[in-house]
């Protein structure tokens, strides 16, 4: 272990923190909006659709009571996750078959891009003897995304544990699995509202910006450095 740290463990959010869902032009090829004028799904529309697929909190379209119920529970049940996001994409103007095609990319671990410093951070923490966990509000198994990227000690996924950030229960599950205390744990995420919930238990918290991967080369390294964990 290289030096001492005030932390025994670091918890990471997934989307917008370790990885980002970044569109490929092929995903939108042949798509048009399901409106009277059949508008083009241009770069601006693509960016907004991706934002709506990945925003950690809040909602971006009008919802019926049934759709709202699915939205509120989306990270607990895969079928509700599908229902909620297909509703968002349909309300955003996509035909159903286009909405289903785009949604299929969102839940495919192979479609998620790691931030440039994710491998360095995961490897560096392991070498220092600092335990790691991914704590994510999600309704699909993201573990395959880490193949060839890095090793994580524990995955605490909302749909598997029945709790959603910022509920302290999901963070406590991570602490228990790692065998660490909140006082010696850092949570890193892109949502002050959701990820910052770890502070309720006494964890430290580092906020990162969910920028495109090409624009955030060392955000994780900087966040750890600011909390006394140089890599």
Question: What are these language model-derived features?
Answer:
Residues 1-12, 20-22, 94-97, 119, ...:
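Asp-based, Mg2+/Mn2+-dependent phosphohydrolase catalytic module
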Residues 3-116, 128:
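N-terminal helical cap/lid subdomain that shapes the substrate entry/recognition surface
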């Amino acid at each position: 272990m290289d030096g001492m740290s005030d932390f025994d463990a670091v918890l990471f959010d997934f989307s917008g923190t370790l990885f980002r869902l970044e569109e490929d032009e092929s995903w939108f090829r042949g798509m048009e909006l399901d409106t009277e004028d059949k508008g083009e799904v241009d770069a601006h529309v693509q960016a907004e659709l991706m934002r709506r697929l990945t925003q950690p909190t809040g909602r971006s379209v009008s919802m019926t009571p049934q759709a709202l119920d699915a939205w509120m529970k989306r990270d607990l049940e895969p079928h509700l996750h599908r229902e909620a996001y297909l509703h968002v994409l349909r309300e955003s103007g996509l035909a159903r078959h286009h909405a289903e095609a785009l949604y299929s990319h969102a839940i495919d671990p192979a479609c998620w891009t790691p931030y440039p410093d994710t491998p360095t951070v995961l490897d560096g923490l392991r070498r220092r003897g600092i335990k790691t966990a991914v704590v994510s509000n999600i309704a699909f198994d993201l573990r395959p995304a880490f193949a060839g990227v890095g090793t994580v000690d524990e995955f605490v996924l909302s749909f598997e544990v029945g709790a959603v950030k910022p509920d302290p229960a999901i963070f406590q599950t991570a602490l228990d699995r790692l065998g660490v205390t909140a006082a010696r744990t850092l949570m890193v995420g892109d949502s002050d509202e959701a990820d910052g919930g770890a502070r309720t238990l006494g964890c430290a918290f580092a906020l990162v910006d969910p920028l495109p991967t090409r624009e955030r080369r060392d955000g994780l390294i900087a966040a750890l450095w600011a909390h006394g964990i140089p890599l």
